[in-house]
Amino acid sequence: MAMSLPQLGGAGGPHTQPSLPSLPAHLQSDTHLTAHLASRFHVSHPTARLSSHALISLNTYTNSSKGPDGGKEGSAMAGAEEIADRAFLRLGHRSENQAVVFLGESGAGKSTIRAHLLTALLNKSSTPLSTKLSLAAYVFDSLTTTKTATTPTASKSGLFYELQYDTSATTNPVLIGGKLLDHRLERSRIADVPTGERNFHVLYYLLAGTSEAEKSHLGLDGGSATGTTQKRWKYLGHPTQLKVGINDAEGFQVFKNALRKLEFPRAEIAEICQILASILHIGQLEFETTSQTSVTGDDSGGFSHEGGTTITAVKNKDVLSIIAAFLGVSAADLQTTLGYKTKMIHRERVTVMLDPNGARAHAGELARTLYSLLVAWILETINQRLCAPEESIANTVSIVDFPGFCQQTPTGSALDQLLNNAATECIYNLTLQNFFDRKADMLESEEVSVAATSYFDNSDAVRGILKPGNGLLSILDDQTRRNRTDMQFLEALRRRFDGKNAAIEVGSAQAKLPGSNFMTENTSAVFTVKHFAGEVDYPVKGLIEENGEIISGDLLNMINGTKSEFVARLFGQDALQTVTHPNERTTVMQATVSSKPMRAPSVMSRKTHRTGRPSTAYKRQQQEAMEELDQQSQAGESKKNAKMTLEQGASGQFLASLDNVQKAVTDPGTNSYFVFCLKPNDRRIANQFDSKCVRMQVQTFGIAEISQRLRSADFSLFLPFGEFLGMTDAETILVGSERERAEMVIEEKQWPQNEVRVGATGVFLSERCWMEIAQLGEAVSVSGRYGGLPSSDAGDGLTPAESMAFGASKEHLVSGGNTPLMYGEKAKGGYFTDDTRSEAGVSAFGGGDMFKNLDTREQMAERGNEKSLEEVEEYRDKPSRKRWVALVFFLTWFIPDFAIRLIGRMPRKDVRMAWREKVAINMLIWLMCAVAAFFMVGFPMLICPKQYVYSSNELSSYDGDKGSKGAYVAIRGFVIDLNAFIPNHYPGSNLVSEDTLLNYAGKDISALFPIQVSALCQGKDGQIPPEVTLDNRNTNITGQPQLLASRDIDVNSVYHDFRYFTNDSRPDWYFEQMYTFKHVYLKGRMGYSPKYVKKLARDSSWNVVTIHGKVYDMTKYLQGGLRLKAKAGKPTPNIPGATDFMEDSVVQLFRSAKGQDVSKYWDNIKLSPVKKQRMETCLNNLFYIGDSDTRNSTRCQFATYFILAISVMLASILVFKFLAALQFGGKNVPENLDKFVMCMIPAYTEDEDSLRRAIDSLSRMKYDDKRKLLVVVCDGMIIGQGNDRPTPRIVLDILGVSETVDPEPLSFESLGEGMKQHNMGKIYSGLYEVQGHIVPFMVIVKVGKPSEVSRPGNRGKRDSQMVLMRFLNRVHYNLAMSPMELEMYHQIRNIIGVNPTFYEYLFQIDADTVVAADSATRMISAFIDDTRLIACCGETALTNAKGSFITMIQVYEYWISHNLSKAFESLFGSVTCLPGCFSMYRIRAAETGKPLFVSKEIVEDYSTIRVDTLHMKNLLHLGEDRYLTTLLLKYHSKYKTKYLFSAQAWTIAPDSWSVFLSQRRRWINSTVHNLAELIPLAQLCGFCCFSMRFVVFIDLLSTIVQPVIVMYIVYLIYQVATNPSVVPITAFLLLGAIYGLQAVIFILRRKWEMVGWMIMYIAAIPVFSFGLPLYSFWHMDDFNWGNTRVIAGEAGKKIVVSDEGKFDPNSIPRKKWEEYQAELWETQTQTARDDVRSEISGYSYATKAQGPFSEYGGGYQPSRPGSTAGFGHQNMSRMSLAHSEMPGNRASQFGGSQFFSPEDLVGMPSDDALLAEIRDILKTADLMTVTKKGIKQELERRFNVPLDAKRAYINSATEALLSGQL
């Protein structure tokens, strides 16, 4: 049969041929096909065809719906519609599933063609359902499409869009549903937008399309975070990306309306927008490193080192509050969660304390999780509303569109790039299979031969990447599941692919760095995959972690408490696959968002019979395989096995979903079409064709090979002969078999050979030929079924959707874990009649505000802060508490409660009460400060008011000479500043020079200013003649300044003489001049002491008296100093009585009582008020000479000496402190001691260097190693900032404990809220060897219950102390113990070999403290010397003294606080603060054994859990070590606490201001509250007034009044600076004595460096004594209050409620040691009887519980033994100090030790075998060089097993053989 290719195009040039296979054979190369495409492109024909199977579309970067003539004919849209028509015809007439697969690079226009195709398909069913399906596609694109460097609409998620049809009733398929399956959204883009690209479009839609009211609600109005006009959003890239030609505002409206038409309620749309806004705000969070200034609410209190804990906090709290409100959580919880991250490391939960960069990444994880879950929820909700039940779906049309091949990843995510390229590789392989291999088997079975066509086969790459089990993605998933490292993954790839697969090359895991001769780990290692589109290098660094895509349990735990139902639904959907704790199924450890869709293609999940399949053997085999696959899929999905979530990472899930796509497309019942989208150029230039660019794409996709294949075999269908003949109306051909008749028909049709072939049982046809015989031309509409089958009756008027009830079908959902309801209810299911749903609900959203009538952001925030509380305790307030509360309300009554709640933002009543208490305490403190200030300044001024008076001698000292204090003069009792007046003297130096004026300085110049008597005095009659004059007194007498005599008239007086008789009379001139002097230049008044006034009257006969503090002199008046003087030229008038103008009674007073204070007489003088007023005016203006000087009066002397007495008393305390510091003599050398001591270190997040220094310093102490026990308590599984391992692992590595030792966690009581009182811990023990010291140790690791996700086990330093205190308390009182305490007892007694009761002392240091080698010895010596000593501390110095200015100012303060304050308190045997960083306590009394430090009262008070008042918070959360000392003084008042300067340690002081401020706030406030606790105690010892109570009171008072003291010093300095004549000598002498005595101390101790430190300390006094106290007092309530609170109950009771649940003490079983020991003894004895091998007798003892449950309940797996040997009988026998009552080897049931476990003995060689081999080795070994270690290594080589567990036996056997004992 001749082959001919029909011309499918019309007449014209070559470009008119749209079908590439129709071109001549010589034009079938890449170059020629590219040229052909170019010729079509240039005439606006951007499409071509590969027969009927595929469309080739070139992106014109213009309107894709316009063809060459302006219509759609010839356009890309027309090509897509043609494919839609073909698919729809095949769907309706053959009931085949249809699939359209898109291929092309990014920017080739796949999304556009896909949209045209979908529109064309949906237009064939113009119903509301089709509209919804179209809108669903728009929603998908909005959520998953972005703008990249190559295209403005780049899809970043694989799409499998399934349109569901019912084809059972008619050849016109009925659209009944749809399904959107998204595959692997590019999540890395959310938090890391590439430069020059955009994030997903919907985020920009939200920002551009919301109204102002909506923006305000969402916090998008730019009012927060920055002060700039345009806010830069981190997650939206560069601001230029907001304006790139995309109409985002319109897009948002369409998006919103699409959701509404898809039946999303308005509230849900608003919630969606809030989540999107939250994601934007998460990008705005700014983090900083700070110090935790307050104890967290669920913490027991205390800090494990000086200062505080370094944490990461959010800077912009306003942004944080917006996010928290929308997520329905509290802002504090959100900040805490972002600052920590919990991981699983070696099967342990570990919380990492993140730095700001880590917190930023954690916030990015939250953003990615929110967006991924939101997309998954929206799509699943759409699917629930649009997807038809599987049983009703007859056929489907699937659109497959995955992102294009990616040569380089813009987001930096190697995983996204790998999975993306894996998908393109798979889809390309599907394409090749469809054209080259799909019909090959059937052609062969039908005995049809087709000429082979060569093509590029990417099967190697597909197998290498996608093969289940050992493909690249499977290996990546397997390595992720096994927690392998990146390098281990690389090695796994090498073993799998090296030399076995040409498509994958594995790079080297090691590399030689420049300048190095050694191979090191290659941090830039890659593996290379040869994809069909080119080679790509994939870095392995971080790939394993990225593939895990772990969402930390912290985020899940936070969201678990959300008050937002919508957020709960997001995190409750199956897309979130959770991993639960193996022992606590309700606890989610971590999770991941699924990388595969929640549904499978209907082809994969439908069990109905697929019609239209040929019944050949091959097809039957395929059908059976598919049905079997369906059954397996259904069974696997129905189980909903949570293990799936544990088994599969992102690559495994994506591989499974890709496999579903592959099987759906290659299903025998599926007909596939392909759309090749090509870019005409790389620069996105419209109408420009780059031949090189296009040829590369044609070559990459193998279009030339496909075209050649179609030229030889273009078969689309296989029709059995009967069906074929029935369709061709071949009844007229009556002769021949079916085959012959078919051949005759084909010959008659003259179809080309490549489109039709006759096989053994049927005919292979192209789609064109089939359409011809089926009479399906362009205008053909066939209503019936082909093949003569009767059509169903569809005349009932109902669509299939209407004729059946659609329920929620979830059979096809992929399992999402076994806890779908953890975060809320499942999403609503169900779908109702598709075409009858009203769309009237789609309307405007609240008039431009979709949040109208919904909760405001403030309401959301308030709801997020609410906690679900449960009653846990009931109690009554103590009377003292009631009295205090009454006082608080009395002091703060004027502050209304609502003001505190609203303005202070304190919704909780207990927090408001604490704030009131703080205010009340501050008021009391300031009252005391005011009293102190009053006594220092106000009291002397009140008793002796300050007088501005000058005696004659003082005035004379102001003579203006060099060295004098100034130039003052006196005028009628008033002292004037001459220096100030001279510059303003009129008429200036022209008349009287300045020197002349200065000659008057220091003198009384009253004579210079003659007075007009009549102008200054009205006399007794109301008028005095103007001629009356009064001479001025000459006061030039002994002891007085040189004054001008009245008779020696000064020549300058004439310038001031304006009396009546002069020619220039000015009566008021003197008054006016004096007014100016008094108000401008007045410095004071002349002062005359009462004694001196009497002397003047007695010795000089002055008529001088004192009236109300004023001194008057009437001597001249009485001695005739008055006369009349008329104007020149006029006679002197004779006026009787003119010079007698004063009342006789007044004159008589001066005569009879001169020298006396006549105030009383003056008050009783018999004058009318008018006359008395006149007389007083005359006295003041004419006879006043000064004030009474009382500065040396008795009253003033009392005020001075009263203050001096107080100063002396305080100075005496200073002297005692000085003497106390001196009384310590030199250091004596202590003797060797035999007391047992526990050395405890509480560890939290310290670095390895600090921990090692602390541990080594304790181990190297000069004290018998076997009598000290090193106890390290690790407070939780936490990785501190800067650490690479959790703190417990660091400690265990230092101590040499192998990672293989993993004891069972055991329960014990902790200090926490509610259920957090139940904690679990692990016990490790062993020997630590350092510098010749071998010290037994025990490590207690608090790991927390399985239900604890964040910071597991962490309860605070006080709880760490209580672990040991409670244990020792129960040991000494023989009380029942918890499982962990029993294990501690066992480890100490049977492993370490010392009875716990033997330990007498507890030595406690911090993890950053280093102790001197003799410190423990000196402290224990003091305990032995004084049996009444209960506790002591030593001197603590700084190791980082020169670290910063902050540390420098603390050096001297540390030194004097010990050597003065503590030394002084030690005199009385009551040191009020024993620092937790360096103290030793007496556990029990030496004589009686009575518990002291661990007595019931102290343990009970110190373990207080209910810390709900301000006082208790300050006691237990700020100064737990000081409170512990307070309890010792309170309950053991007969015992002493001392300070030993000979014991020394060094610690690290805060080196930053924030940490220093935090530390001092805690110290100052705890000091105030602890001293307040001590003052009421009646048992405080002491003698006379120097009792301990007095010392405590002085300490408390000095702490409180520090700010006033500083202010007083400033006041003194000001006084000296402003008035040099007044120097408070006493005050400065005291200040000098304070520091002088301190200097004496460090000089005597030869601490010369303290001179410099003292100067720095003095400079910092304002900080220490003023700034810090003020800050501390006001921040007294600065706490994280947790969620436990107190509410009022009935009958005056208080109810404690907590969100941590109620703790049941019975949940922790307890046993006495004797009972526990008896059980162990019985079990051990039985085991020893049954076990032949005594070496492992400890094994069955340790695993005596045969059932599935632990001895202590809880349903956990039986524990495994942790250790079976103690210190070893040969080498460590000296350690067996206490008799062991355990038979056999010492073994731990639960604890871990560094020796070996019975598990390690399984499979070990026997001792006899080892001994024989050792003999053999020693026979040939060089005995001069052989070592035990070498023998052990040789034995391990021979037996091929590690022999660490047999080390002790090997060593002892070797010694025995060498010594001849064996």
Curated annotation (Swiss-Prot):
Binding residues for ATP: 104-111
Compartment(s): Cell membrane
Gene3D superfamilies noted in UniProt: 1.10.10.820, 1.20.58.530, Cytochrome b5-like heme/steroid binding domain (3.10.120.10), Homeodomain-like (1.10.10.60), Kinesin motor domain (3.40.850.10), Myosin VI head, motor domain, U50 subdomain (1.20.120.720)
A Pfam family annotated for this UniProt entry: DEK_C
PROSITE patterns attached to this UniProt entry: CYTOCHROME_B5_2, DEK_C, MYOSIN_MOTOR
InterPro entries reported in the protein's UniProt record: Chitin_synth (IPR004835), Cyt_B5-like_heme/steroid-bd (IPR001199), Cyt_B5-like_heme/steroid_sf (IPR036400), DEK_C (IPR014876), Kinesin_motor_dom_sf (IPR036961), Myosin_head_motor_dom-like (IPR001609), MYSc_Myo17 (IPR036037), Nucleotide-diphossugar_trans (IPR029044)
Domain Myosin motor: 1-778
Keyword terms of this UniProt record: Actin-binding, ATP-binding, Cell membrane, Glycoprotein, Glycosyltransferase, Membrane, Motor protein, Myosin, Nucleotide-binding, Transferase, Transmembrane, Transmembrane helix, Virulence
Changes seen on gene knockout: Leads to morphological abnormalities such as hyphal swellings that are indicative of alterations in cell wall structure. Abolishes the ability to infect and colonize tomato plants or to grow invasively on tomato fruit tissue. Also leads to hypersensitivity to plant antimicrobial defense compounds such as the tomato phytoanticipin alpha-tomatine or H(2)O(2). Does not affect hyphal hydrophobicity but leads to compartments containing up to eight nuclei. Is still able to penetrate tomato roots, grow efficiently inside plant cells and elicit the plant defense response.
Catalysis: reaction(s): [(1->4)-N-acetyl-beta-D-glucosaminyl](n) + UDP-N-acetyl-alpha-D-glucosamine = [(1->4)-N-acetyl-beta-D-glucosaminyl](n+1) + UDP + H(+)
Family: In the N-terminal section; belongs to the TRAFAC class myosin-kinesin ATPase superfamily. Myosin family.
PANTHER family xref list: CHITIN SYNTHASE
The protein's role, per its UniProt record: Polymerizes chitin, a structural polymer of the cell wall and septum, by transferring the sugar moiety of UDP-GlcNAc to the non-reducing end of the growing chitin polymer. ChsV and chsVb do perform additive, but not redundant, functions in septum formation. Involved in cell wall integrity and resistance to antimicrobial plant defense compounds such as the tomato phytoanticipin alpha-tomatine or H(2)O(2), and plays a crucial role in vascular colonization and pathogenicity. Also plays an important role in nuclear sorting or distribution.
Name under which the protein is recorded: Chitin synthase V
Lineage: Eukaryota, Fungi, Dikarya, Ascomycota, Pezizomycotina
